[in-house]
Amino acid sequence: MTPLDTIRLYGTAPDSIVDGPGLRFAVFVQGCTHGCPGCHNPDSQPACGGAVRRIDELAAEIEANGLAQGVTISGGEPFEQAVACAELARRMRALGLNVWTYTGYRYEDLAALANRAAATGAVCAAHDTPAASARPSLPSVDPSGAEALLAATDVLVDGPFVQALHSFELPWRGSSNQRLIDVPATRTSGRIVLWDTHEDFPEKPASW
């Protein structure tokens, strides 16, 4: 457990060209419960590893970088530090940087968790009583944090890494089951909207 104004990191890459379009500042969080065989960053899995950093210091470092066209939050599993990652993502968008978030969870499960928590919270507040349905179905994910991180993400790369589906031909994904989801468009339309890319040049979503 880390203080609310901190984030536990596996590391950073201030000039990544493989974690989304353009030159990006990649932030790799520490801790992941998925345990995908063939994981690219297995040392990022233990929750007690890495180093704890203040979010405001990390945000200042990214702002001072000056070259990054966007920020990618990867890991590890960002949604297992959803509150901290959401705060970082909000600050990055306030700077005019687009945010990509990688997760081993599926968008539908994260959205359902966030929506169910919001609905249950409203019912509990109205009746002043807790409800068993408030318990999240993803025990390692904070429901309100999941909602906040989804709201602060432009593109979500979702789904676990599946070694049998691995291909080096996939842009910004490790396996073909993973999707590049335009989160603002998806949340507006109520259906999955994939982020459009061309072979040579990534299209910028209208929501950016």
What is each residue range found by the language model?
Residues 5-10, 23, 41-136:
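Conserved Radical SAM active-site core
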Residues 80, 164-165:
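Short glycine-rich, flexible loops that bind phosphorylated cofactors or substrates
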Residues 153-155:
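Well-ordered beta-strand positions
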